[in-house]
Amino acid sequence: MDRVRGCAFLLGVLLAGSLFAFSVAKEETKKLGTVIGIDLGTTYSCVGVYKNGHVEIIANDQGNRITPSWVAFTDSERLIGEAAKNQAAVNPERTIFDVKRLIGRKFEDKEVQRDMKLVPYKIVNKDGKPYIQVKIKDGENKVFSPEEVSAMILGKMKETAEAYLGKKINDAVVTVPAYFNDAQRQATKDAGVIAGLNVARIINEPTAAAIAYGLDKKGGEKNILVFDLGGGTFDVSILTIDNGVFEVLATNGDTHLGGEDFDQRIMEYFIKLIKKKYSKDISKDNRALGKLRREAERAKRALSNQHQVRVEIESLFDGTDFSEPLTRARFEELNNDLFRKTMGPVKKAMDDAGLEKSQIHEIVLVGGSTRIPKVQQLLRDYFEGKEPNKGVNPDEAVAYGAAVQGSILSGEGGDETKDILLLDVAPLTLGIETVGGVMTKLIPRNTVIPTKKSQVFTTYQDQQTTVSIQVFEGERSMTKDCRLLGKFDLSGIPAAPRGTPQIEVTFEVDANGILNVKAEDKGTGKSEKITITNEKGRLSQEEIDRMVREAEEFAEEDKKVKERIDARNQLETYVYNMKNTVGDKDKLADKLESEEKEKVEEALKEALEWLDENQTAEKEEYEEKLKEVEAVCNPIISAVYQRTGGAPGGGADGEGGVDDEHDEL
C-alpha cells in the first residue's frame, strides 16, 4: 500500500517547462473547412459562423436564434429543441433537459444526487457514471450517456448551420464553462465526436464572450470582468484586452448555479402554497411539475421587466385551474442566498488577478440570468456604483466569440481576425500525490495555457521497482480533499536504494485545457504517459464508436420520419388543392361534367378518409395513394383544360396545382 500511496518524495525540483503563449491563427489551418462556433448551453444552445467579414448567428428551423437544449422521445420519433420542450408537460418522463449538469460527473457526485430528485426523467448508475434511462419508440427502454444526449443537441446545431450555409460542416469550436474540470471538457469533446464533429477547439465561455465584446475595440489596455450567469453554470473571468490580445488573468465560478436553480425556488414556493391552500401535494406529479416548471421560467423572465406577474396554469391538478401572483420582491427573497453566492467567485477572481475594484474598466454581462435586476444591483454595489456594460447580447455573445475563434482556426477570418491572440488559463491547480497524501502542485490555477511543467521525483522505499503516479486537481494541500483525475504505474525501474532513481513527471495542458501526463525514468529512459481519462468517467473508444453508430441510426430514423411527413403533406396538399379547384366557380366548378365532378369528388373523399385512418402510414403508402388519386383526377382535369383551351395541370390562374409540392407552414 505504501508503494502506491507514497510513490514519490520530492528530491530536487527541475522546472523544465515554462509558460508559453501561442498564436491560434497558425494551428491546423490547412486541414479545416469552415469552422462553426457552438455555445452548448445547459438550457439553450446557439450557433454562429464567421462569413463575409462578420459573425452570423444562425436561426433554427423555427426562426429562433437560440434553441432549447432539450431532447424528447415519443412513440414514433425523436424531438430536439423547441419541439421537445413544447411537449414536455404531456411527456415528462421521456423529455431530457439540463444534461450539461451531468456531463463529465460521477454518479455519486452530490450535485448529481440532488438533480436526480428534481428532474422527471430517470438517472441510473452505469459504471459509476450517471446515464439517462428513457423509453424510446415501441416502449423499448434505453440508457443514454450525457455525452450522447449532448451530441443530439450538437447535431441539431450542426444541421442548423448546414441548412444556412448549404454545405456539410465537419469542424466546430465548442464552448464550456471556464470552471469546467478536465473530465467535463473531455466529455464535451467526446459529445462532438458522437455528433460527427471534429471539435477543433474547446474554449471557455467567458473568454468567447470577451471576444464578442472586444473584437472591434481599439485603443489602450483595458481590464474587463466577464460575469457569465447562464441557465445552469456560473463563471467569472477577468481579462486584459489590448489591441486584439485577450489575456485571462483569473477565472472562478460554480458549475452548478444558474437560472434553473432560480426556477426551482419558484416551483418550491408554489408547491408549498398549493399544499397549504388546496391540501394537494404535486411534488411527485411529473405532469403538473412540467407545467409549473414552464410557468416558473416564464414568470422569472417577466419579472426582469415588471414588478408583478400572475402565474396562471389551466388544469394544474384534478382539473383545478391555478392562478397566483408573484412579485419581484418575493422572487428576490426566494433566491437571495443564490444571488449573493455569485459574489464569492467575483471576490476570488479579483484577488487572484491582483486588481483593485477601480482597475476594472468594464463589467460585461453574459447569460440570460444576468437580466435579473437584483443580480445587476449586487454587481453594481460591489463595484461601488459602476454600471455593467450591456453592449453584448447575453444570449448570443458566447456563440459569437466561438465563431470568431473558428474563423481564426480555419483561416477564413482574414485580416479582421489575424491579429487576435487568446491567452487562456487552467482554472484549477493540477498536481500529483507524494508521500503522506500531500498534493504536490505542478501547474497552479490561472496558469496560461497551453503549458508544460516537469519536476523530478524519486522513490520512497529501497529496491522499489514501480511507482504509481496519481494525478489530482484542486486547491487543497492534501489529495484526499482534491479530485482524483487518474493514475498510472511506471514499472521496470532498476532496484536501488531509496532516493536514488530519478523519475521526471511532465504535465502538459493543451489549448483545450485537457491534461496529458508523462513519467520517465531518467536512468533507463523508460516512460509511460496518459491523457487523463478520469478513471471510470471517460467513455472508451469502443463506447464512442458505438455511440457514433447509434447517432447515425437515429439521424437516419429522423430522416425517414421527415420523409414520411413530407409524403403525407404532399398527398394532403394535392387533395385539398384539387378539392378547391373542382369546387370553385372561378376555377373548374362550372366546366366539369357532373359525372366527372362526381368521380373526382369520390376519389378525394375516399383519399381523405384513408388519411384519417392511416395517420402513421409509411412514406411509400402515401406515395402510392397519391398516384391512385392522381390517376383518377389528372386525366379528367387535363380533358377539361383541353375542352376549354386552358393549360393542363396547373389551373387557369396557376393554382389548384397538381404539382404543388411546397412544404406547408
Curated annotation (Swiss-Prot):
Keywords: ATP-binding, Chaperone, Endoplasmic reticulum, Glycoprotein, Nucleotide-binding, Signal, Stress response. NCBIfam families: PRK00290.1 (NF001413). This is Heat shock 70 kDa protein BIP1. The gene is BIP1. Glycans are attached at N614. It is found in: Endoplasmic reticulum lumen. Coiled coil: none annotated. PANTHER family: HEAT SHOCK PROTEIN 70KDA (PTHR19375). Induction: By dithiothreitol-induced endoplasmic reticulum (ER) stress response. Induced by tunicamycin-induced ER stress response. GO terms for molecular function: ATP binding; ATP hydrolysis activity; ATP-dependent protein folding chaperone; heat shock protein binding; protein folding chaperone. The keyword Cell membrane does not apply. Residues 642-665 are annotated as: Disordered. One of its GO terms (cellular component) is plant-type vacuole membrane. PROSITE patterns: ER_TARGET (PS00014), HSP70_1 (PS00297), HSP70_2 (PS00329), HSP70_3 (PS01036). Gene3D superfamilies: 1.20.1270.10, 3.30.420.40, Actin, Chain A, domain 4, Substrate Binding Domain Of DNAk, Chain A, domain 1. A motif (Prevents secretion from ER) lies at residues 662-665. Interacts with P58A, P58B and ERDJ3B. The keyword Transmembrane does not apply.
